[in-house]
From Swiss-Prot:
UniProt entry keywords in alphabetical sequence: Cytoplasm, DNA damage, DNA excision, DNA repair, Excision nuclease, SOS response
Keyword match Cytoplasm: yes
UniProt similarity note: Belongs to the UvrC family.
Limits of the UVR domain: 203-238
GO biological process, one term: nucleotide-excision repair
Lineage, top ranks: Bacteria, Pseudomonadati, Pseudomonadota, Gammaproteobacteria, Pseudomonadales
Complexes and interactors: Interacts with UvrB in an incision complex.
GIY-YIG domain segment(s): 16-94
Record's protein name: UvrABC system protein C
SMART domains: GIYc, HhH1
PANTHER family (alphabetical): UVRABC SYSTEM PROTEIN C, UVRC/OXIDOREDUCTASE
Gene of this entry: uvrC
Length: 607
């Protein structure tokens, strides 16, 4: 079930400018992308009490979060909306056809190189393009390149072991170099075109493709001309969305916005005159911090604090600070690069500067509204639980498994400002009877609170457990064993109907049973934390289960240890391809004898 969305609190800070909005459910899955000439007016129409179409009502019932991006005009909103729909294919749209290092597009070496996403140190031989501000932005570029030029994006191990073309060939996203369906010369031309696009030379590329199209048409090769026409159309669409008129070079457009509740820095990345994407940062700030101080601190930490971060030639900012000269000099000394920090800009550059300011302000206002809303929920919870003070730290635990397989317990932490994700924890449960949720909860709580007793971590004000009477009794037993007898315990059980809003709650023991009204702010907080614990548990469980299933069939083979298992899976591109391999094919893998290959084959096909 999705957490309850407070539409009135959101709309109170929503902009009336043109833009794009994205609606998510309680598990952060994108439900719908839309555009609007007036974001506030359009979004308000979703939350009317009457007159909604059945499909719209079903969508609204699942909304847990709404995000917006302000654009300069409705046309830009339309272009961005279409790109997001193509990339994410949200279920409620009409469909016609995020401190990690920043990702790059990587082009490998070799006769038939691959394109892919790369993070971290640049150790592999090849070319790197970027950095991109987000994985979404980089996937958009890779998707466009795959549609236009069909350069492969599969892993080398998968590519090396293909005996027939894969689905990407069937849907015309790859030309099948793995099975010699394209010549090296033709493939090299596709790679060259891809590089031109990634280098920001789309205008030159478009002219070249247009000349080739006319040449193909003159030669009556209409199939080739149509293919080139489609490539040109794709390039024009991305140019309309991503290019700054009259712009060139590498630029970061940065705006800081501060009000009494916090600060936001919005960064727009432009490379080769092309907008790659944007990102919000929310630095911790003191009371009445000056916006120029926030900007200077951000530039110092963001650019000086990471030697691997690629520097643009120019930073466009919305405020000035006396430290800017020192920052540019330090960057020149440490990185050997000249960099200009610009404040007074004109034309299109001024327009993008203002858009960065607008997005920073909107993002901060939305964040602060959520904080205030969360604080009110904490106050309501304190009242219904009869606490003398508003709790400052809530922890919630949940268990996830598949018929006892790969059991994982989750711990999520919330404060009056929202989730404290740095304090989230997962526990891989071992040595308990399969499917015994009580034993799993006992192990997780004992491990967590045993560390707290030893001085590691903070004790919460309220401990929530999902599961009702049995899990509450288990939590109480553990707390008594460890001496935390004053900790407030809250059990959350689904009601008889098992519908959201009808939960049964137990305070400290199973005899203190009560329910809350469906519109209770305290209940909404409990639901939100419970659902977040469930989400965090199930994602951890799925990852653990997937990892176990990838290697379990090889674990009992004598002579195949962890390193050899990894090497085998890497060589074949995964367990599925290894399962398809014959004994002779397995024996060709590095370090695998014919006898060992027979043992591996027998283990994989034992059922």
């Amino acid at each position: 079930m999705s957490q309850v969305f407070d539409a009135s609190a959101f709309l109170a800070t929503c902009s009336g400018r043109p833009g794009v909005y994205r609606m998510f459910d309680g598990e952060a899955r994108l439900l719908y992308v839309g555009k609007a000439k007036n974001l506030k007016k359009r979004l308000a129409s979703y939350f009317r009490k009457t007159g909604l179409a059945p499909k719209t009502a079903a969508l609204v019932a699942r909304i847990a979060q709404v995000e917006t991006t302000i654009t300069a005009n409705e046309t830009e909103a339309l272009l961005l909306e279409q790109n997001l729909i193509k990339e994410w294919r949200p279920p409620y749209n009409i469909l016609l056809r995020d401190d990690k290092s920043y990702p790059y597009v990587f082009l490998s070496d070799g006769e038939f190189p691959r394109l892919g996403i790369h993070r971290g140190a640049k150790k592999a031989k090849g070319r790197y393009f970027g950095p991109y501000p987000s994985a979404g932005a980089i996937r958009e570029s890779l998707s466009l390149l795959q549609k236009a030029f069909s350069v492969r994006q599969c892993e080398d191990s998968y590519y090396a072991n293909r005996t027939r073309p894969c689905l990407q060939y069937q849907i015309k996203r790859c030309k099948g170099p793995c099975t010699d369906l394209v010549t090296a010369e033709e493939y090299a031309e596709d790679v060259r075109h891809s590089v031109m696009f990634l280098e920001g030379r789309s205008q030159q590329l478009g002219n070249e493709l247009n000349a080739e199209m006319e040449k193909a048409a003159m030669a009556l090769d209409f199939e080739k001309a149509a293919e080139l026409r489609d490539q040109i159309a794709l390039l024009r669409r991305v140019q309309d969305q991503q290019y700054i008129e009259g712009g060139s070079g590498d630029v970061d457009v940065i705006a800081a916005f501060v009000n009494p509740g916090g600060a936001c820095v919005h960064l727009i990345s432009v490379r080769g005159g092309r907008v790659l994407g944007s990102k919000n940062f929310f630095p911790q700030v003191g009371i009445e911090e000056e916006v120029a101080e926030v900007m200077a601190a951000f530039l110092s930490q963001y650019y000086l604090g990471n030697a691997e971060r690629e520097l643009p030639g120019e930073l466009i900012v919305n405020v000035v600070h006396e430290d800017f000269n020192a920052i540019t000099e330090a960057l020149h000394t440490l990185r050997g690069r000249e960099l200009t920090i610009s404040h007074r800009v004109r034309g299109t550059r001024a327009r993008w500067q203002q858009l960065a300011v607008t997005n920073a302000e909107q993002a901060l206002n939305a964040r602060l509204a959520n904080r205030q809303h969360m604080a009110a929920r904490f106050e309501a919870l304190a009242e219904v639980l009869g606490l003398d003070e508003v709790p400052q730290r809530l922890e919630c635990y949940d268990i996830s498994h598949s018929s006892g397989e790969a059991t994982v317990a989750s711990c999520v932490v919330f404060g009056p400002e929202g989730p404290i994700k740095s304090d989230y924890r997962r526990f891989n449960i071992e040595d308990v009877t399969a499917g015994d949720d009580y034993a799993a909860m006992h192990q997780a709580l004992t491990r967590r609170y045993g560390r707290i007793k030893d001085g590691e971590g903070k004790l919460p004000d309220v401990l929530l457990v999902d599961g009702g009477k049995g899990q509450l009794n288990m939590a109480r037993d553990v707390m008594q064993e460890l001496g935390f007898t004053d900790l407030t315990l809250l059990g959350v059980a689904k009601g008889v109907t098992r519908k959201a809003g009808f939960e049964t709650l137990y305070l400290n023991d199973v005899h203190h049973e009560f329910t809350l009204k469906g519109d209770s702010s305290a209940l909404h907080l409990i639901q939100q934390i419970r659902d977040e614990a469930h989400r965090f548990a199930i994602t951890g469980h799925r990852a653990r289960r997937g990892k176990a299933r990838r290697v379990s069939s090889l674990e009992d083979v004598a002579g195949v240890g962890p390193k050899r298992r990894r090497d085998l899976l890497k060589h074949f591109g995964g367990l599925q391809e290894l399962n398809r391999a014959s004994i002779d094919e397995i024996a060709k893998a590095p370090g695998i004898s014919k006898k060992l290959a027979e043992s591996i084959y027998a283990s994989l096909h034992s059922e």
